[in-house]
A protein has these predicted regions:
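Glycine-rich catalytic cores of cysteine/serine-nucleophile enzymes that process amide/ester linkages
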Residues: 22-92
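Activation targets extended, charge/polar-rich intrinsically disordered C-terminal tails
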Residues: 22-24, 55, 107-154
Length: 154
């Protein structure tokens, strides 16, 4: 009779819900030509475990003004966020679950790119694909820094 109590306890314990661990998920996207300039960006969504901060944003790096000047050389660059429709019309490629430390490192990288001085955007050496690649490398992924596809985010 008393042997059934441990079995019932284990059964009950296995059926009760366990609080989900808070985490931020980084999803890497690309956006095709069409009505918009092609683009690569990272969407962050979730909850920072240590602070409880809810995160739902995205970051990409682009020229302040998309004009023929980007074909001639470096121009002013900026970090930008896109709206829900733009994201819905984009292509998610992969996602990574971030620890609080990884999230903090990624946000520091975003801040660094946001504060790059002068003409920081270059179609050939510092564009949205480079930004996404550096974010992926920062999070521990292997990247090909010699790729010929830096002008083609998809």
């Amino acid at each position: 009779m008393f042997r059934i109590f441990p079995v019932l306890f284990l059964l009950f314990a296995s059926l009760t819900s366990v609080a989900a661990k808070a985490e931020v998920v980084a999803t890497f996207y690309s956006h095709d030509f069409g009505d918009h300039f092609p683009h690569a960006f990272v969407k962050l969504k979730g909850k920072v475990d240590s602070t409880g901060e809810q995160v739902d944003t995205n970051y990409g790096f682009t020229a302040v003004s998309v004009s023929p000047a980007i074909l001639m050389g470096s121009v002013k660059g900026m970090i930008e966020t896109k709206g829900d429709k733009y994201i819905a019309d984009s292509n998610p490629h992969f996602s990574l679950r971030l620890s609080d430390a990884e999230y903090a490192k990624l946000m520091a990288m975003v801040d660094k790119w946001k504060n790059l001085p002068g003409k920081s955007y270059s179609l050939n050496s510092r564009n949205c694909v480079h930004f996404a690649m550096e974010a992926a490398a920062l999070l521990g992924l292997s990247v090909n820094r010699k790729s010929k596809f830096f002008k083609k985010p998809k």
